[in-house]
Amino acid sequence: MKRTLVLLFTLIVCVSLIGAAEIKLDVQEHTLSNGLRILMIPKAGVPRVVCHIYYKVGSINERPGITGLAHLHEHMMFKGTEIMGVSDFEKHTAIDQKLDAVMNEIFREMFWTADGGDQDKIARLQKEYDELVKSEKQYIIKDALWTLYMKNGGTGLNASTGNESTGYYVTLPSNKVELQMLLESDRMAHAYFREFYSEKDVVMEERRLSENRPGFYFSEQVNAAFYSASPYHWGVIGWMDDLRKVTKSDLVEFNKSYYVPNNAVAIYVGDFDPENIVAMAEKYFGRIPKGPDVEPIRTYEPPQYSEKRMYGTGPAPTSIQMMFHAPYAGQDDSAALSVLASILGSGGGGGGRFRGGGGGGGTGRLYKSLVQEKQLAVSVSASSRAMWYVGAFQFRATPRQDKNVSPEDLEKALWEEIEKVKQDGVTSEEIQKVQNQVEARFIRSLSSTAGLARTLGRAALHRGWRTV
């Protein structure tokens, strides 16, 4: 069995930054009366348009008992609406309501009783459920959304859920953007969560596959220990027990609370006339009523006043992690720590110019010192991640077992490297080199229409697109 050591601390390091290059974006903005923001960047050339919609909702908007719901909801948004994905809405709805009633009974037996319920009753209800599922299938049109998009030249239909936001993406010919407006406004206003229980099984299988990866459980527990109170305490996939017990009514309430126009931003980048985009947005999205004001997260991460240590054993290489609480996105020192991580680790981050940085490249200070010179580690990395409400600075290293190097030996060596930075700082040449790399990488990300839309959308949800 391999042993892993994790240290959880608080870190304050200041690095002066050379002024970053200014990026100018030709963004046109329009806000509908219901609060939906439309951001447009016209780019003449290839007659295609990248269409993204971002909702300001992610795993941080969950609570204990419904963790993983934001990600599950993303899956369910591809199951159709009242008019899409079903051949006979009324007949299907009648069956679907019976399915919900049967599953509610099964849930009561399984989860609301101390002994796991009446097994004979559960078996009978399960048989009834299986028969209803067979009846339901005759009315379901599989992959209706994707099929319709593909028939009209659509590519790249996808979605993603993070801690703080959820995005839905498609690229279409310029003359088919109206189709995206029609379909996405329909999903926003009339999403229908058919096949909920089978899709929940799909998400639970995703989690099982993650659990089979070496080190998954330990990393999950490290994260839970590091973020003790805030909703960053759990991962986007959620806890398995919550996934088992989450109900369709939980999902419906989640949808009503967060999938509203005043909690979203639509991004269009490509060959189009902005006036036409605004007119179509008013026509389709403008008819959706404004939703309730979205409540911000309540629980912020409290200060950590003492060191935490975790030891674990399992089928994974021996390693050490050291994590430090750090400034969150937008705070002055978050950019400095991103640069420091790249100097130490010499790798690439993401999520904006200075939202994340670091890596484990062969040109970083840590690699030169701990791998090449002292030969204490097989690999070593440093990373900085600044999120909306929390930040983390992290070291990871794998000791040289052939030289009997222990995690404690590596811990001591890492502290020595930290002290060097605190005592001697970093050179202007190191800062300039990293800044050049970060700027080049950031500009490359903006050179693609999809990368530009993604950067713009996520920034718009947080501190505004002008902070890009």
What positions do the PLM features span?
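Bacterial N-terminal signal peptides
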Residues: 7-16
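Positively charged n-region of N-terminal signal peptides that target proteins for export
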Residues: 1-4
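Catalytic Zn2+-binding segment of zinc metalloproteases
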Residues: 75-85
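His/Glu-based metal-binding/catalytic segments typifying zinc-dependent metallopeptidases
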Residues: 208, 224, 293-365
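Non-catalytic, conformational "gating/processing" segments within enzyme and secreted inhibitor domains
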Residues: 193, 200-201, 215, 219-220, ...
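M16 family metallopeptidases and their MPP-like homologs
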Residues: 41, 46-62, 69-72, 85-186, ...
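Active-site His/Glu-centered metal-binding helix of metallohydrolases
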Residues: 69-77, 340
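Boundary at the C-terminal end of the N-terminal hydrophobic targeting segment
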Residues: 18-21, 25
